[in-house]
């Protein structure tokens, strides 16, 4: 058994929370392990002046950490799963999918009002094309403003009056104890989350069997089935973090229900569909994701995504 483990992580408050949570859980199961953190600055942390959709690079928040992992400078990397591209680099694998937090998105507004009750032409901040597309399909009057930076930075900009409302993932808001600022939690029939939202992905080297065995104690089988289905759908659509695709899987009593959305950035075109099938393994879940992706492509998703890629 290893005596030491080094966890690679970004240095944002949320990333540190996630890494410390992972460290605490692993220490609980393996008290003899000496576990330390190595902080890594990623491209996404440095390039804060441009919208994420304009940078055009998958793995903005993961690539630099993965370099340290491949170089054996760290033993594992802890990511927000929604930031992890569906094609992991050769030699690396997501070995553990942690139990998922609430996957929904939330509205934080000056008035305390929810999405339907925001004033006409309200300024809404989000860095996500997925959120933008779904927002504009319901409220085409909204002025969508790009926002970058960690959660604390976003709340400061909000408190300084730079916009009227902002949309964030519930999981991050809850983990950093900003829940009292929430104006509305949006249900999935209004706003589908990003693929993998609410879960952590623990990445290891494929040849490091000992570390894989260690981190598997944190794996939640329901979360793995849902997230692998979602990631298979995203992979089949050749989408990434900055494409307007939303997806959510729920797994109850051996049945997987997968909801998915593909839309144009302006919100004028929105495709939604769902698929429910019995599933026993992560591989079967991935097949459901691919099948639903094919349904969306037959509905016209290919043209929507091609048009978006032309403008990037």
From Swiss-Prot:
Keyword vocabulary terms for this entry: Chlorophyll biosynthesis, Porphyrin biosynthesis, Transferase
Protein name: Porphobilinogen deaminase
S-(dipyrrolylmethanemethyl)cysteine modifications at: 241
Subunit structure: Monomer.
Its EC number(s): 2.5.1.61
Cofactor(s) the protein needs: dipyrromethane
Native organism: Chlorobaculum tepidum (strain ATCC 49652 / DSM 12025 / NBRC 103806 / TLS)
Lineage: Bacteria, Pseudomonadati, Chlorobiota, Chlorobiia, Chlorobiales
Gene behind this protein: hemC
Involved pathway(s): Porphyrin-containing compound metabolism; protoporphyrin-IX biosynthesis; coproporphyrinogen-III from 5-aminolevulinate: step 2/4; Porphyrin-containing compound metabolism; chlorophyll biosynthesis
Family per record: Belongs to the HMBS family.
Cofactor binding note from Swiss-Prot or TrEMBL: Binds 1 dipyrromethane group covalently.
Catalysed reactions listed for this entry: 4 porphobilinogen + H2O = hydroxymethylbilane + 4 NH4(+)
């Amino acid at each position: 058994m290893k005596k030491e483990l080094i966890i690679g992580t970004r240095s944002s408050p949320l990333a540190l929370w996630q890494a410390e949570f992972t460290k605490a859980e692993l220490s609980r199961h393996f008290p003899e392990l000496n576990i330390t953190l190595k902080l890594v600055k990623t491209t996404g942390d440095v390039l804060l002046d441009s919208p994420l959709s304009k940078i055009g690079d998958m793995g903005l928040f993961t690539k630099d950490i993965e370099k340290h992992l491949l170089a054996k400078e760290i033993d594992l990397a802890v990511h927000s799963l929604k930031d992890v591209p569906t094609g992991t680099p050769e030699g690396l694998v997501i070995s553990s999918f942690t139990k998922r937090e609430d996957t929904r998105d939330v509205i934080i507004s000056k008035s305390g009002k929810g999405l339907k009750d925001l004033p006409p032409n309200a300024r809404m901040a989000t860095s996500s094309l997925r959120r933008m597309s779904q927002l504009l399909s319901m409220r085409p009057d909204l002025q969508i403003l790009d926002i970058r930076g960690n959660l604390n930075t976003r709340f400061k900009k909000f408190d300084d009056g730079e916009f009227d409302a902002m949309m964030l993932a519930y999981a991050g808001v809850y983990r950093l104890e900003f829940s009292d600022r929430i104006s509305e939690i949006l249900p999935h029939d209004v706003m589908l989350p990003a693929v993998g939202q609410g879960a952590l992905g623990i990445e290891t080297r494929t040849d490091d069997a000992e570390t894989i065995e260690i981190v598997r104690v944190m794996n939640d089988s329901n979360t793995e089935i849902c997230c692998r289905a979602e990631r298979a759908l995203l992979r089949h659509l050749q989408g990434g973090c900055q494409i307007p695709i939303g997806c959510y899987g729920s797994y109850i009593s051996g049945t997987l229900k997968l909801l998915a959305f593909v839309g144009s950035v302006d919100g004028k075109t929105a495709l939604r569909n769902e698929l429910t099938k019995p599933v026993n393994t992560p591989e079967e879940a991935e097949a459901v994701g691919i099948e639903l992706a094919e349904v969306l492509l037959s509905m016209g998703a290919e043209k929507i995504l091609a048009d978006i890629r032309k403008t990037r």
